[in-house]
Regions:
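Juxtamembrane segments at transmembrane-helix boundaries
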Residues: 19-39, 53-184
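Hydrophobic transmembrane alpha-helical segments in integral membrane proteins
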Residues: 1-19
Length: 184
């Protein structure tokens, strides 16, 4: 039976590794929801609970291949994203894949920093040290990204000119996503 502290560590990590990216990826499309905001927030809460369950599964049942857990989480996230947002496929795919790549980068950078600071703890899974470092890196990266989304990215998404570029530009972050998937 896992102890309470390890359980809380897994839960905090699970939410810290999902919620900032989920919220930031839907931010530019906040005026294009298919459902009322209350329903969207209910879906977000449900995804948070599912992510906690998946994080607990990953932390305390390490014999299960991590690719299965990753695929389940990814499919749920993609299904939510495309079910809740009503926008051009290319715009949504580009945003979702770019945010996923940023998430992967933040996780990798955080693990490297943890290894430099606390090498013994870096070899263990779901440790508070990694979660704290990851949250600090998220703040450093995602706060400026939020302002970029607000001032630059969202107005570009709302422009009517250049719509044809969105048909193919999502392939660029997809390429990086595939590379991340096979390297990790």
């Amino acid at each position: 039976m896992p102890d309470v502290l390890n359980l809380v560590e897994a839960w905090i990590y699970s939410l810290a590794n999902l919620m900032p990216y989920l919220l930031l990826s839907i931010y530019p499309f906040r005026h294009n929801f298919r459902f009322p905001r209350f329903i969207v927030w209910m879906f977000i809460a449900l995804i948070g609970v599912i992510q906690i369950i998946l994080g607990t599964w990953a932390a305390f049942f390490p014999d299960t291949p991590s690719s299965i857990k990753s695929i389940v989480s990814t499919v749920i996230y993609i299904a939510f994203y495309f079910a809740v947002i009503k926008a051009h496929f290319g715009k949504m795919a580009f945003t979702l894949l770019a945010m996923s790549n940023i998430c992967n980068m933040i996780v990798a950078v955080s693990k490297c920093i943890e290894y430099r600071i606390l090498p013994e703890m870096a070899m263990q899974g779901y440790r508070w040290s990694f979660t704290v470092i990851m949250i600090v890196v998220e703040i450093i990266v995602l706060v400026p990204l939020y302002f970029y989304f607000k001032k630059v990215y969202e107005p570009v998404l709302n422009q009517e000119t250049g719509q044809s570029m969105w048909r193919f530009i999502w392939v660029v972050p997809l390429t990086f996503y595939i590379v991340w998937y096979y390297i990790a």
